[in-house]
Amino acid sequence: MTSERALTLAPGKVSTADIYEADFSFRREFVRQILQREFILFEISMYIIFIVTFCYKIILFLFRIIPKDLDHRQRNRGRKMSASA
């Protein structure tokens, strides 16, 4: 018997098994919805973590390249000045 049928019968005609079946199917659907919602939140948080990590890696890469590039340019300027003098 379906859960809708079990809930629409008169109170005297509903068996205990029908009530348990209706309650179980309702709880199963409720748990499925909660798990689906939690999985979506988990997936969104993983995307956010990925984006933040990617931006962090780009910033670290730029901070590592820029000082080396500035140091290299300063050394080249020093060589050009000493060569022209």
Curated annotation (Swiss-Prot):
Top-rank taxon, per record: Viruses
Mode of membrane association: Single-pass membrane protein
Protein's cellular compartments: Host membrane
UniProt KW keywords: Host membrane, Membrane, Transmembrane, Transmembrane helix
Location (main, coarse): host cell
Record's GO cellular component terms: host cell membrane; membrane
Transmembrane regions: 39-59
Protein name per its UniProtKB record: Uncharacterized gene 11 protein
Organism this protein belongs to: Gallid herpesvirus 2 (strain Chicken/Md5/ATCC VR-987)
High-level lineage: Viruses, Duplodnaviria, Heunggongvirae, Peploviricota, Herviviricetes
